[in-house]
Amino acid sequence: MTNIRKTHPLMKILNDTFIDLPTPSNISSWWNFGSLLALCLIMQILTGLFLAMHYTPDTSTAFSSVAHICRDVNYGWFIRYLHANGASMFFICLYAHIGRGLYYGSYMFQETWNIGVLLLLTVMATAFVGYVLPWGQMSFWGATVITNLLSAIPYIGTTLVEWIWGGFSVDKATLTRFFAFHFILPFIITALAAVHLLFLHETGSNNPTGIPSNMDMIPFHPYYTIKDILGALLLILTLLALTLFTPDLLGDPDNYTPANPLSTPAHIKPEWYFLFAYAILRSIPNKLGGVLALLLSILILIFIPMLQTSKQRSMMFRPFSQLLFWTLIADLLTLTWIGGQPVEHPYIIVGQLASILYFLLILVLMPTAGLIENKLLKW
């Protein structure tokens, strides 16, 4: 008799996705991040659900409801910090996953890649609206500053901002709708992730060499399930260490002060995972120019498959491209650091140079390196 997992309509889908899936035999630990992202998403939805049971999306009670969760709800402090630091782990996995895709040429699966970029934008939107909910100083002013950027759009900007706010400033209506968005978006992310996986399984996974691996495939289970479990344990260990020992390491102290529209914090800045984009935004003195640069810093990922000049897919055997890739990583770390610094000399010029280098590397230097490597190999 055929095994039920191969015949049952639902089990068959799960079987073809996680059990009998033919997988390249040589994929490294950089391929672990997909499953880690799934784990992060599940964890964020569960902790978020329990937080939503005690949170009130109202300007007069939001801050105190978060304090109530931390003080009076059983293990409320733990759930709250798991959720906050879980977001950081989510972005660490997300950036590692994108970095892997860039390095090994996984972006040549264009549908999978484009859904991935859409997923990145949705996760960023979710994190942004979620950051507003505790209604601390940085929540309020972060929301005010970032939503205000839309006013740079010619003609309709101001109307658009007031429409998003639901009034003439960030207020009760804004908080309520941001809570609604923050609740619904993770489910949209889940649906998009399923589509992402669907497109990936149309082509099969890439591998470190970038060479088709049809001739050497192994079943996903048990080889990669056990590998994913190891990755998951390391992720959980890191998250627990962060949550239990230094829960506020990545947060902002200003968020322990209730939101006050009459007092602006000295340095308004977003969470660490948005600092690179924030630095690019600030490095351009013009408001509209800054907004466009901010958008392009993320949307540039869509154009990467079109900028592929090398005849080799992966960077595994391309030393020039590797050097430029790691320069890009160093540049992003520099931008992240600059985004958290005040707007003064020498940070302004460093941020501007790092922003120029970011676009130069992706749009000019990396495609040129690909052409040079082709030439050196007489291809």
Curated annotation (Swiss-Prot):
The keyword Transmembrane helix applies. Heme b b562 binds at H83, H182. It is found in: Mitochondrion inner membrane. Heme 1 (or BL or b562) is low-potential and absorbs at about 562 nm, and heme 2 (or BH or b566) is high-potential and absorbs at about 566 nm. Component of the ubiquinol-cytochrome c reductase complex (complex III or cytochrome b-c1 complex) that is part of the mitochondrial respiratory chain. The b-c1 complex mediates electron transfer from ubiquinol to cytochrome c. Contributes to the generation of a proton gradient across the mitochondrial membrane that is then used for ATP synthesis. GO terms for biological process: mitochondrial electron transport, ubiquinol to cytochrome c. Belongs to the cytochrome b family. CDD domains: cytochrome_b_C, Cytochrome_b_N. The chain crosses the membrane at residues 33-53, 77-98, 113-133, 178-198, 226-246, 288-308, 320-340, 347-367. Pfam families: Cytochrom_B_C, Cytochrome_B. The gene is MT-CYB. Binds 2 heme b groups non-covalently. Disulfide bonds: none annotated. It is a multi-pass membrane protein. The cytochrome bc1 complex contains 11 subunits: 3 respiratory subunits (MT-CYB, CYC1 and UQCRFS1), 2 core proteins (UQCRC1 and UQCRC2) and 6 low-molecular weight proteins (UQCRH/QCR6, UQCRB/QCR7, UQCRQ/QCR8, UQCR10/QCR9, UQCR11/QCR10 and a cleavage product of UQCRFS1). This cytochrome bc1 complex then forms a dimer. Signal peptide: none annotated. One of its GO terms (cellular component) is mitochondrial inner membrane. Keywords: Electron transport, Heme, Iron, Membrane, Metal-binding, Mitochondrion, Mitochondrion inner membrane, Respiratory chain, Transmembrane, Transmembrane helix, Transport, Ubiquinone. This is Cytochrome b. It comes from the Eukaryota. Heme b b566 binds at H97, H196. Its main location: mitochondrion. InterPro entries: Cyt_b/b6_C, Cyt_b/b6_C_sf, Cyt_b/b6_N, Cytb/b6-like_sf, Cytochrome_b, Cytochrome_b_C_euk/bac, Cytochrome_b_N_euk/bac, Di-haem_cyt_TM.
